[in-house]
C-alpha cells in the first residue's frame, strides 16, 4: 500500500501549491465537503448554522479551520508514510472528542481530490490524483487502525 518515491514527489509537488494558499484551499475543501455531505456539518458546532456556500465563504471560523486541517495534513504527507507521531494525537482527538467516523475522512479525501483537480488541472493529472488518493488512503487506514486501538467504532 506504500507509495513509491515518485508518487510521494507527485503528492508533495501539488501540496506545495496548496501551501501557497492554505486558507483558500481549506475553505474550498470544507465547502465542498459540507455541500456534498451535509451530514458532516453536524460534527461542527461552529458551522452547523451555515446553510449555503455563500454563508460558508463568509465564515472566518470556517476559513481558519480549513487552515488547521490542511496544516495538519501537510505535516502528515511530508512524513511520506512515517507519520505515527502525527497520527496518534489526531486519531485520539477525532475518536474521543470529535467522534469523526472514518467515512467522513473518506468524504474529505474526495473533496481534497476534487478541489485540487479543479484548481490545479495542469499539476494534478491522473498520475498525481492516483498518488494523492493512495496517500490519503494510507492516512485513513492508519487513523482507522488507531481508532480500533482506542475502541472507537467510527
From Swiss-Prot:
O2 binds at residue 65. CDD domains: Mb. Nitrite binds at residue 65. It is found in: Cytoplasm, Sarcoplasm. One of its GO terms (cellular component) is sarcoplasm. One of its GO terms (molecular function) is peroxidase activity. It comes from Nycticebus coucang. Pfam families: Globin (PF00042). InterPro entries: Globin (IPR000971), Globin-like_sf (IPR009050), Myoglobin (IPR002335). The modification Phosphoserine is found at residue 4. GO terms for biological process: removal of superoxide radicals. The modification Phosphothreonine is found at residue 68. Heme b binds at residue 94. Keywords: Cytoplasm, Heme, Iron, Metal-binding, Muscle protein, Oxidoreductase, Oxygen transport, Phosphoprotein, Transport. This is Myoglobin. It catalyses: Fe(III)-heme b-[protein] + nitric oxide + H2O = Fe(II)-heme b-[protein] + nitrite + 2 H(+); H2O2 + AH2 = A + 2 H2O. Its EC number is 1.7.-.-, 1.11.1.-. Belongs to the globin family. It comes from the Eukaryota. Monomeric heme protein which primary function is to store oxygen and facilitate its diffusion within muscle tissues. Reversibly binds oxygen through a pentacoordinated heme iron and enables its timely and efficient release as needed during periods of heightened demand. Depending on the oxidative conditions of tissues and cells, and in addition to its ability to bind oxygen, it also has a nitrite reductase activity whereby it regulates the production of bioactive nitric oxide. Its main location: cytoplasm.
